[in-house]
Structures are given as structure tokens and as C-alpha cells.
Amino acid sequence: MLEGAVKRTLYELKWRLHHPAAFDKYRRVLANETVSPDELLARQEAARRRIVRTAMEKTAFYPKFYGAVGFEAGDSGKEGWFERLPVVTKRELRERRDGFVNPERRSSLRWFTTGGSTGEPVKTGFDESLCEEVYNWRLLNRFGVHPWDDHAYLWRDLRPRRIAKLINAAMWWPTRHLKCDVSSLDEAGIRAFLGDCRRLRPTLIYGYVGALAQVARFVLERSGKSGEGPGGAEGWRPKMVWSTSAPLSAVQRKMIETAFGAPVCDEYGSCECRWIAAQCPECKGLHVNVEHVHLEFLGDDGRAVERGEYGRTVITNLEDEAFPLIRYENNDRGRWLVDPCACGRTLPCIDSVKGRESESFVLPSGKVVSGEYLTTLFDARPDLVRGFRVVQHRDASITVEYVPAKGRDEGERRMAEALSGLVRVVGGEVPVAFKPVREIPHDRGKLRFVVREK
């Protein structure tokens, strides 16, 4: 108890020195979880007007961009005004990036480059003075985890020099952060990570989906051997596992939860706009951080799709006045959930992101097999496999690679039965093969389970 109190006191002291308003903002976002939906909508409308006004007055890009469609600052009071604004694409962001900068806030601007998983890496900016960390704290609070607790990370190590690691550890002291570099994670690295976890006993394990799945698979394959699991003989379990950076399939969720003995929280964000949405312990959808971001899902006609239908994801960062990003299409696909969450929180929910537009398959007839469908192939039978990915080859043929569940290699006939829906969708246009493999490869911890060969 004393150690926890010391950690909390020092953690809060550091944040108050670094960002005096951080905990006031945190209390506000916690209270927002029970604000009425109508009040949340009204606040979002005011925030949209404010960020659009700032963008038109302070940046070089938006006045010309909106002027091209006849939109003026005074139009924000008219019905449907926001939907009239043109959508910003990755191309505009990449080619006209400097025009998005508010010169009055340049001193607080930090640059970040997206990973380019869609083939279009983009450099974007964000205001580091906003204290977006409060959305992290709110998420942890839902699972009974504190930001000053000891945490473990399966992540790419961006501080290769020893001095940088020592400085980072000193900044966080006495809170300890166990970090495992997943850039090239092997069996020895996994054993070392699990051993460190047993000693440190972190309340949270945070990581890329691919790395979490790799460690979970290792644990399950050796679950009968003494001391090989996360807790070993000590019986330690984290309070939560936090998955990020890629869609989380039902197969992966089941495997990770079984291996670590803890609920898995799926979180959605992007390099262009972090902290978009995250799950609660109900794990039925992701609550949107409506104070921070406005979400839209659009059809091919540019209009909002019906609630429950999938559409192109368009995001507006409501807080960042240093680098306003308004109605930005990030190439993901998603949808609003129809029913409210059973947890009682009033923050609206979206479904887990099912796939990017670039991950859809195109058949010879021109028919498109959507990425959001392909990511759910084993949702009805997650017990059959420990992992999978679907590959469309250059000749348009499709191969489903899967890691059989322990002791359950069903063979191609059983797999064909389980995946009869895919065969039916393809309709005989191209061959569909099923291939058991030892593991599904990941790229430095990030997992792509829908792949279209170029």
C-alpha cells in the first residue's frame, strides 16, 4: 500500500509540474462518461464550430480549400453546414502539410510520421500541450488499472542507446516500465519477457496485436510445463491486456485472454489522430472519446451511412488548434453500433475496425470482397485456430493460412466447412486454398491478416 501511495504521489507531482491542468481535465473526461447523449452532441457541435473557425482564420490551407466549394466562415450556423465541408485526403495532407500549421501554435507542434501500412506514409503534426494522456488514464480506470502502476510493453524499441533508456527510466521512477523490443522477437526474448513479468508483476500488458498473439501462442503451447505461463508457480495475472495498432479478431482475443488470464481491451487510434475510441470491460464495442474527436462513416456517395452499416472513416480532431485536421479520411472502414453499451456509459460506441479499404480483394469480375468481412472469417469458430491470415495472390487466387488450435488440426475438409461462407462469396471465380502453418508472420509486432499481393 505504501509503495502504491508513493508512486501515485510522485506520478501526480511530475504531471502537475509538466502540465498543471492535467488532472482537472482528467476529472472532466471521467464525468463525461455519464453526461446525457443530447448534451454530448451539443458540446460536439460547439467544438466543431470552434475548430473550423480556427482553421479558417489561422491556417493557409483551409480558407482556399473551403473557398473552392463556396463555404465561408459565417456558414457554420446553417443546417448541415459541417457535412458540406470537403473531405481531406492523405494526398492533400502529404502534399500541402505546411498549410495545416497554425503559426501561432507552432512552438507546441510535434511531428509524427505514419507507418505507411496502407502504402501511403504521411507526416503529420499534433499539439503536445493538449495532454491527450487523460484519455489513456480514463481507459485504464475502466479496468481498475492506474497510470502509476508498473506496466509491461511489447513494442518497438525507439531508444536503442543505453543512456536514453536510463533517462526514460529515471523520468518514470518509481513506476517501472518493462519494455520488450518486438522488432525481431524470438523464443529467448519471449522467455525473458515472461520471466521479467513474473518478477515485476505489472497490472497492464500493452502491445501490438501481432506481438501479443505471438507471446500468447508461446504460453499456450507450453502451458503444461511448470513456470512457462505468465504467472508460473506464482499465479500472477495482469488486470488487463491492451491491444493496439491493428484490428483484433475474435480468434486473437480468445487466445490472448486464455494465455494471460485477463480481459483484452481493443483500442482504436491512428498516427493522424490518437485516442479515437476504446473498449470498456463489456468488450461489445469501442467508446468514442467525443471530447477529442468527431467521427463520421461515409458511403460512396459521400453521405453518412445508416447506423449499423459500414462506411469510410472520416475523423475530425476537435482539440488540436496547432495542426487542425478536419474531416480527414484515414482509409479505415467502420460503423456505429446501434445499441448503447450495457456498461451504462453514455459515450457512443463504434464496432471494432474490421479492415482498411486497401485490404479488400478484387475478383476477376470486378466484385469486391470487403476487408471487414475477411477479418471475421473465424469469428463463429474461434476455437478452430490460433491465428490466420488471408492472402490474395497476384493471379487473384486466395489462400487462407491458419495455425491449427492445439491438438485440433481439422484438415482441409473441416476448414472448408468452416469457411464455406468465403467459398460462397467468391463464387468459383478464383481458387480458394486452405494451408496450415506454424505461425503467422508479423512486421515488427504489427499484424496484417488480410494481405493483397501487389
Where are the regions a protein language model picked out?
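Conserved AMP-binding/adenylate-forming
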Residues: 248-340, 357
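AMP-binding/adenylate-forming catalytic core of the ANL superfamily
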Residues: 205, 319-428
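Short, structured coil segments at secondary-structure junctions
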Residues: 173, 237, 259-263
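Hydrophobic alpha-helical segments, especially N-terminal targeting/anchoring helices
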Residues: 298-299, 362, 441
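AMP-binding/adenylate-forming
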Residues: 130, 150-211
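Short, hinge-like loop/turn segments at secondary-structure boundaries
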Residues: 169-170, 223-224, 282-286, 451
